[in-house]
Regions:
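Structural motif corresponding to the intra-repeat A-B loop/turn of tetratricopeptide repeats
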Residues: 59, 130, 317-319
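Conserved, well-structured interaction surfaces
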Residues: 4-63, 78-86, 95-108, 286-300, ...
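Long, intrinsically disordered, low-complexity segments
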Residues: 14-20, 90, 157-218, 295, ...
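An aromatic- and glycine-enriched ligand-binding surface/loop that stacks and positions planar moieties
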Residues: 96-99, 113-264, 389-391
Length: 402
């Protein structure tokens, strides 16, 4: 992996995944020999197994193969290639051990560590990527059954994207961040313990003090605007997720302030940007400061309960449950956003068949989970990347597929 800038970035990701795997392997190889409480020992081993599975999950998503390294090795060790299925098999083993030995919850001093629910949610996702929907449903059902005790949707969805209510009942697994620059060197996120994504997503120049990388697509804005809430207003998930030209017109009762800009809508015209220029607003830190930097304190939510609900609905309909019954779990997410149930919406015809329901569910996932890191997995699972019909479906929305 050498040559272009993209290849260099790929190499950095590859290297860092395997650095994480190496550290997990050190724990798994050495902790068993330590004399300590057996429950605590197994919890440590389970945490390492969970994280190793998480890194291998990403490797499978990005490269569909890798090298399966399960023990610490010398620097001159050259691993053999492993197939995608061999890696999935190891992920299943690691997560099965993790869920059997992790607690359902940690006390306040250990919040943020992997839990039984996190292992089950990730295992459910691993099964879904392999189209093992029966097995995935079983894992996700465990979390669904604990709604109201361990898990649930927050009343205010946006609390999932700030530092004001972290490790809450909707957060299944979160990467813990603070805003302190702890030093260090490197060309990547290893130089700080802060959340850096917003620095790269924020608009460039004095308007957003960021780099404008990873822009949103206009089709997503348009899709949000197709349906209003039951109170007649536009979907606030759009306001909190995407910054776009004339966004203030669509949300007249919301603030136009964005970082140091009292009216952020004006600089779209100042810079000659058109309606296709859209920026990712989710996770931004303008609620407490006027400029972005590399040290945001927001936790990054790897998995949250809204994702579990939508995934469970997909598993249900893929295993023979009616679209109407599966819609119950989609409606929980929609109603939290202020929308009507599917049966009362403009999309009510989606309940007529599995195929039509799946297409609507695909859009519901895009709206609720945009920019949270699961879109690539979704597209792969739905077969939209490996068939001409799938590519043709994506082309009108995203020019990168043309």
């Amino acid at each position: 992996l050498v040559g272009s800038e993209m290849c260099i970035r790929d190499r950095v990701h590859w290297e860092h995944f395997y650095v994480g795997i190496f550290r997990c392997n050190q724990v798994l190889a050495n902790v068993p020999a330590i004399e300590m409480d057996e429950v605590q020992k197994n919890q440590l081993l389970a945490q390492a197994s969970f994280l190793r599975a998480l890194w291998y999950f990403q490797i499978n998503l990005l490269w569909e193969k890798g090298t399966l390294v399960l023990e610490p090795q010398n620097a001159d060790y050259i691993p053999k290639d492993a197939s995608e299925q061999e890696i999935w098999d190891q992920i299943e083993k690691d997560l099965t051990f993790a869920m059997e030995n992790l607690p359902e919850a940690w006390d306040a001093a250990d919040l943020g560590r992997a839990t039984k629910g996190a292992a089950k949610a990730l295992l459910g996702k691993a099964y879904m990527q392999q189209h093992k929907y029966d097995r995935a449903k079983e894992q996700l059902q465990w979390l669904i059954d604990r709604e109201g005790s361990l898990y649930g949707l927050l009343d205010n969805r946006e609390d999932n994207f700030t530092d004001l209510n972290e490790n809450n009942q909707e957060g299944i697994f979160e990467i813990q961040f603070d805003d302190q620059n702890k030093g260090g060197t490197g060309n990547d996120a290893s130089m700080a313990f802060g959340f850096q994504r917003t620095q790269f997503y924020a608009p460039g120049g004095t308007h957003g003090t960021g780099w404008g990388d990873g822009k949103a697509r206009r089709w997503l804005v348009d899709e949000f605007l197709k349906e209003r809430r039951v109170d007649g207003r536009n979907d606030l998930r759009l306001y909190n997720s995407i910054l776009y030209k004339h966004f203030g017109d669509d949300f007249p009762d919301q603030s136009k302030k964005y970082y140091a800009n009292e009216d952020a809508s004006q600089w779209f015209d100042e810079w000659g940007q058109d309606t296709e220029d859209c920026y990712i607003r989710k996770y931004n830190t303008s609620y407490y400061r006027e400029r972005e930097d590399y040290f945001a304190r927001n936790n990054y939510r790897i998995m949250r309960y809204a994702d579990v609900l939508l995934s469970y609905a997909e598993c249900l309909v893929e295993t023979g449950t009616s679209a109407s019954d599966a819609a119950v779990y989609v409606d929980k997410v929609r109603e939290r956003a202020g929308l009507s149930k599917l049966k009362d919406s403009r999309w009510k015809d989606c309940l007529s068949s599995k195929e039509v329901f799946i297409k609507r569910l695909q859009m519901e996932r895009a709206l609720e989970l945009c920019f949270e890191g699961w879109r690539w997995a979704d597209l792969k699972r739905w077969g939209l990347l490996d068939s001409q019909a799938g590519i043709d479906e994506l082309k009108p929305r995203d020019k990168d597929f043309n």
